[in-house]
Amino acid sequence: MEKDELTYHVPVLLKESVDGMNIHPDGTYVDVTFGGAGHSREILSRLGEGGRLLGFDQDEDAERNIVNDPHFTFVRSNFRYLQNFLRYHDIEQVDAILADLGVSSHHFDDSERGFSFRFDGALDMRMNKRAGLTAADIVNTYEEERLANIFYLYGELKNSRKLASAIVKARNGQSIRTIGEFLEIIKPLFGREREKKELAKVFQALRIEVNQEMEALKEMLAAATEALKPGGRLVVITYHSLEDRMVKNIMKTGNVEGKAETDFFGNLQTPFRLVNNKVIVPDEAEIERNPRSRSAKLRIAEKK
């Protein structure tokens, strides 16, 4: 793996996830979170002459990592449009779909992108820099109740109402544009011993709202269910409870709400069988090499 790709993002659970795709040399595969190309390169190394891989990423920075391989096609798009682009490329069904839902190290470490509270910079957080809504737009324009709901639902923050109130009060004087200005408002609401964890939750909540992550994930999972061949694999790495719940539900019941449908006779109609009944997590060696992998959970299901 080249240096640029390693600095962009270290692939998490690389062997476990690609093994879980059950790759055949002449199969058709999709990596819906191309990023630093770590998983994609491993998939390509297992393909033969008839094999094909599509890699999705909405971030223009990921285009620097495009793989020069005749079996690879890069799709610059949000993975919520999976089905549209499969049709565009004349692909009816695929053999496996991989999604690593973690934010790339590149995003956290680039101060201009605004994903981390470790750096000052614009309060941005857009995965797609061409998209309109930024984190600054949210904190400056959303009503107090809506802000509180975002922090409660997407950050699971107990003091969501206090946060929203403090933000609305502060912005009455002047707009909040930088991470530094934002931290001055919210830091006093957290105790020093839990400050980093709570700030991470605030930034997670804003990032999810900016990028419509839950809506996009729901649409991608539904599209993946339709796109997979019988025997095809859905392989997903999650990093927080909100996305993990959706993935677990669709694999167990066929929808993200977790409500399994039944046929006329009351038999459960579930599209998948679980390949791993217990989630796969990084071992201590991987966590030591890549601390950001600590919260990763890998789930694998096979289409019936």
From Swiss-Prot:
Q: Where is the signal peptide?
A: none
Enzyme Commission code:
2.1.1.199
Which residues bind S-adenosyl-L-methionine per the record?
A37, G38, H39, D57, F79, D100, H107
Q: Which domain of life is it from?
A: Bacteria
> What keywords appear on the UniProt entry?
Cytoplasm, Methyltransferase, rRNA processing, S-adenosyl-L-methionine, Transferase
Task: Answer yes or no on keyword Cell division.
Answer: no
- Gene3D superfamilies linked to this entry: Putative methyltransferase TM0872, insert domain, Vaccinia Virus protein VP39
> Which is one GO molecular function term here?
rRNA (cytosine-N4-)-methyltransferase activity
Q: Supply the name of the protein.
A: Ribosomal RNA small subunit methyltransferase H
